[in-house]
């Protein structure tokens, strides 16, 4: 939350306002990103996930349009995808910056073995091929503040809870 000074009244403070946020989740499939969204952000942020855009030929373009629409409407939004590389995250960070949003990253620092086990418990479309998890693990580059994040956190699943630490 931020405080703003009203025009014409030096030193006066406006009521607290909600800061526009673009939250970017980064991690392997089945690392807990969607569960984390539901627990931490569902009540306050929009949700954009390529998993929900299955039939679209250009999911990246559709994702960008959905994020842009939320930010343009003044709504904070979470991008819930693997976002494994700097190149995958860069357009999102730039988009958030363009709207003056605070860009926050959550890196899900999960072991591949744990993700495979959680994935095996999934059913239907929620389950991804194991090869997809291995492929993402090979490409995954942990995010850094140098990419333009205002805040960056490391998330580790710990049983039924998430351990979140600033990076």
Task: Say what each PLM segment does.
Residues 39-40, 91, 95-99, 139, ...:
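Alpha-helical structural signal in soluble globular domains
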Residues 60, 64, 86, 109, ...:
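Amphipathic alpha-helical transducer elements in NTP-driven molecular machines
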Residues 64-68, 96, 121-125:
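Short, hinge-like loop/turn segments at secondary-structure boundaries
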Residues 2-26, 31, 42, 111-167:
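Conserved GTP-binding G-domain of TRAFAC-class P-loop NTPases and closely related GTPase folds
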Residues 45-47, 103-105, 151-154:
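Conserved beta-strand scaffold positions in the cores of enzyme catalytic domains, especially
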Residues 26, 31-87:
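Conserved substrate/cofactor phosphate-moiety recognition/catalytic segment
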Residues 85-118:
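Mid-chain, well-packed structural core segment of small domains
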């Amino acid at each position: 939350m931020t405080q703003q000074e009203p025009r014409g009244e030096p030193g006066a403070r406006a009521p607290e306002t909600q800061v526009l946020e673009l939250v970017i989740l980064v991690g392997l499939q089945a690392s807990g990103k969607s569960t984390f969204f539901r627990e931490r952000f569902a009540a306050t942020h929009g949700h954009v996930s390529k998993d929900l855009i299955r039939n679209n030929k250009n999911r990246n373009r559709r994702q960008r349009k959905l994020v842009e629409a939320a930010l343009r409407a003044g709504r904070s939004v979470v991008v819930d995808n693997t976002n494994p590389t700097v190149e995958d995250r860069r357009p999102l960070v730039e988009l958030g910056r363009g709207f003056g949003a605070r860009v926050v990253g959550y890196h899900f620092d999960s072991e591949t073995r744990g993700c495979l086990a959680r994935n095996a418990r999934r059913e239907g479309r929620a389950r991804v091929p194991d090869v997809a998890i291995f492929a993402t693990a090979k490409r995954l580059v942990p995010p850094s503040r140098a990419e333009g994040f205002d805040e960056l956190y490391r998330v580790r699943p710990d049983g039924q809870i998430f351990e979140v630490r600033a990076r």
